Amino acid sequence: MAKVYYYGTGRRKKSVARVRLVPGEGKFSINDRSLDDYFGLETLKVIVKQPLTLTDTLTKFDVICKVIGGGFTGQAGAIRHGISRALLKADEELRPALKKAGFLTRDPRMKERKKYGLKKARRAPQFSKR
């Protein structure tokens, strides 16, 4: 028999997270590693757990996640977005709380492209009067 699970895709910067919520006791598996192994910084762990703590479902679901691309902060944001979307599939009544916290909104901020004649996106070469 197939297991019941709720699926959500989250994105942030260059990161894409495919998240599965399985009824369980609150374990996290990110790319086959635990949450503590994958994210070293405490702030990133908090970001990942935010939707579950907000909706009091931290001990109701196990989170299985595959995330690719970007850096650690982008990946944490993508996982948060994916968990929020998966929670909606589990219980549509959580929408107002998640929406108010801003977890359902895809953060549109992306890296600005480098322009020719400049060192970075906006950093100009050093100016010398003489």
Curated annotation (Swiss-Prot):
Q: Where is the signal peptide?
A: none
Q: Which cysteines are joined by disulfide bonds?
A: none
Residue ranges under compositional bias (Basic residues)? 111-130
Family matches, as PROSITE patterns: RIBOSOMAL_S9
Single annotated GO MF = RNA binding
Its keywords, alphabetically, are: Ribonucleoprotein, Ribosomal protein
Q: Which InterPro entries match?
A: Ribosomal_Su5_D2-typ_SF, Ribosomal_uS9, Ribosomal_uS9_bac/plastid, Ribosomal_uS9_CS, Ribsml_uS5_D2-typ_fold_subgr
Keyword Ribonucleoprotein recorded: yes
Alphabetically, which GO biological process terms does the record hold? translation
A Pfam match is: Ribosomal_S9
Annotated segments matching region Disordered: 104-130
Coiled-coil spans in chain: none
NCBIfam families listed in its UniProt record: PRK00132.1
In the record, the note on similarity to other proteins reads: Belongs to the universal ribosomal protein uS9 family.
- This chain's protein is named Small ribosomal subunit protein uS9
Organism, as annotated = Ruminiclostridium cellulolyticum (strain ATCC 35319 / DSM 5812 / JCM 6584 / H10) (Clostridium cellulolyticum)
